[in-house]
Each structure stands twice: as C-alpha cells, then as structure tokens.
Amino acid sequence: MAEEAKVDVKTSAKKDIRNYLCQYCGISRSKNYLITKHIQSHHQMELEEERDDEACEVDEESSSNHTCQECGAEFKKPAHLKQHMQSHSLERSFTCYVDDCAASYRRKDHLNRHLLTHKGKLFKCPKENCKSEFSVQGNVGRHVKKYHSNDNRDKDNTGLGDGDKDNTCKGDDDKEKSGSGGCEKENEGNGGSGKDNNGNGDSQPAECSTGQKQVVCKEIGCGKAFKYPSQLQKHQDSHVKLDSVEAFCSEPGCMKYFTNEECLKSHIRSCHQHINCEICGSKHLKKNIKRHLRTHDEDSSPGEIKCEVEGCSSTFSKASNLQKHMKAVHDDIRPFVCGFPGCGMRFAYKHVRNKHENSGYHVYTCGDFVETDEDFTSRPRGGLKRKQVTAEMLVRKRVMPPRFDAEEHETC
C-alpha cells in the first residue's frame, strides 16, 4: 500500500497543468495571461482579420436591420427606426386634448411640444429692450445666441446706448440657417477668390466684421465664408468638378451631375419620383404627396388663417406660413445676408438671397471705359423699339453693377 501511495504522488507531481491552449497554433500555457500575451505578440495578423470581419458583420446587421425602406435613412438603434417610421405614416394617432384644438401628430414628442403652446409663452428674453417671448425654453438660448451674442461689441463700435433699439432683434426661434453665418463682410479684401493672404488657397479660418472666425471656400470665384466647417463641406459638394463626377441624372431635361450614387438617388427621389393621387388623380412628387392628401381630409384642414395686422388681407393655410409672413413683412426681419464681400444686402427669405447671389448682379469686369446698359434693357410699354445689338458691341460689352461709378472705374 505504501508503494502504491508513492507512485500516485510521483504521477501527480509530473501531471501536466498547462490547460490553456492557443486557438491559432495550439501551444499550451499554464496561465491565461500567458496565452493572451502569446497571441498579442505572435498572432497580430489573425487578430486584425477578426476585427475586420466583426466590423463588416456589424455594418451588415445595422444596414439590414436599422435602415428605412422608404427614404434610406440609417439608425443605430431599432427604436430610433421605429420612431422614424411614424413620420412616413399618414395616420395621426396623437391628438391634442385641449378644447377647440383639432391638431394631431404622428409622434408623441411632437404632441408634447405642441401642448407647450397652450400654456402660453412662459419664457422671455433676458436681454433689455427685447420683448421676444417663447413657449420652449430651448428657443430662448437659440435666440440669445443668434441676436444678442455681439451686443456688447456692437455698442462699443457704434456707441449705442441702452435705450437705443436694435432693429435686428425682432425675431424668435427661426431655425433656418444662412450659408453666410450672418456676417455682412465676409473675407473682405481677398477679391472674392476664397484665398487667404498667403495665396495658398486653403480653407483657413478668416476674421469677419463681428470678430468670429469663419472658414472660407477655396473654390476660385466663390469666396463664401461659413461659421462651421460642416457648412463649408456641404457647400463644397455643390462645386461639382469634371474629374470627380461619378453619376449623372438621365431624366429628360435634367442631366445634372453628382459626385456619388447616393446624391443621385436622393435627387431622383425628391425631383423625379411622382405618385398619382388616388382621390383626384393629380400627379405629385413623393415628398409632397402627404401634404396634398391632407387637402382632401376635411377634418384635419384648419381652414384659412388671416393676418391680424390692420390693413393686411393676407391669408394662409398653415400657422408656420403666417409666422414667416409676420417676420418678413411686418417685423422687417432680414437674417439672410449676401455672401459676396462688400455687398451687405439683407433678405427675408433664403431663396431670395440665393437668387440674388446666382444672378448677374455681382458679375462685372473692370474695363477701360464706362458703358451703360441702355441697349440691353427690355422695351418699355409704349416706348421705342429695342435696338439690335451688333457683334462688335457684344465683344466690347462690360456688365457693371448699378452702384459702379466712373471714379471707382478709373481707379481699377
């Protein structure tokens, strides 16, 4: 018995305790951290391949499970996708329970935001001489940041007192953002070429008249300045170059070029995808079909909303359109500034500002002589017939802005 006990002790002492194996080469170690250290030092390529495979699987799962089938929007969580799908539904299940209010919404958070309007405008602007009131507290901070961020600097420069009224402080929670960032003089002195003083053409931050750093578009002939780099990146996508064109719209009469397939698909969905109305048979874009169907629903149509200002007979179908009318016409709020340096013209609507920038108002060439546009003006009613322009006149023509005088021309 004693001899058998000695044999068992010897065999137990020689027992292999290396229980942790490497999954790549099969080597064994006695401790788990030794195997981990071995894998990190000898199997780096295998680990990188596994990480790439896992990332691809995660991307496939997220794209397949959390992508909207209607518009192609992607979400990280299925709850966000479910909430987004409610915006595509025509059913408005969340109805306002306040008397004499027929407002209804597709999402509950939109209803909660609407209920704040019934409680009145409880939040006022903390600045003096500003009577703006808001129903949501978050709009107060947005209003102060937009209209009162440079009050102290403006008072020092212009000498305005506390009792003076600032005409630009008449707005409320306007969520539209202008591409120029609200700076009247952007990139002044660079000739509108979008290049910095060094002449390298990089989009570096520039100092505007309000003291805020802005990034300038480096495209030749553009020179627009933006407050955030993300706005500049979105603007630079509009400058489609021939070497970066990958897709174009093949619809008749369109033939627009795009840098990638995603931009082309979004363009087709918004501009060329039409749906016929089942009620009246009219043809509408897919993005406008929901608004058209609400016109057939008598219960949801609120009727015409009249402007309460005396002497104004304007009527609107939506309260949001009435608010835009009040800001532009009666309050004379013009938040959108022309992006060309030295212009300073302000507009109440963004599309009017864009039309002004795209027109030939700022396109001119400094010539050796002063020439008017009398021969190019349209024929007035009851006036003389317009003269026929010769080829020599077209070659010698210089298009000049109305404010351009002879003295400034001689200095060019």
UniProtKB/Swiss-Prot annotation:
Enumerate the subcellular locations listed in this protein's record, separating them with semicolons. Answer: Nucleus; Nucleus, Nucleolus
The answer, when asked if GTP-binding is one of the entry's keywords, is: no
Compositional bias ranges of the Basic and acidic residues kind: 148-188
Q: Where are the zinc fingers (C2H2-type)?
A: 20-43, 66-88, 94-118, 123-148, 215-239, 247-272, 275-296, 305-330, 336-362
- Per the annotation, which location comes first and is thus the protein's main one? nucleus
**Tissue expression notes:** Expressed in seedlings, flowers, siliques and seeds.
What segment(s) does the record annotate as region Disordered? 144-207
Locus of motif Nuclear localization signal: 384-391
Record Gene3D superfamilies: Classic Zinc Finger (3.30.160.60)
Question: What does the UniProt record say this protein does?
Answer: Essential protein. Isoform 1 is a transcription activator the binds both 5S rDNA and 5S rRNA and stimulates the transcription of 5S rRNA gene. Isoform 1 regulates 5S rRNA levels during development.
- The protein, known as: Transcription factor IIIA
Which organism is this protein's natural source? Arabidopsis thaliana (Mouse-ear cress)
- The gene from which this protein is expressed is TFIIIA
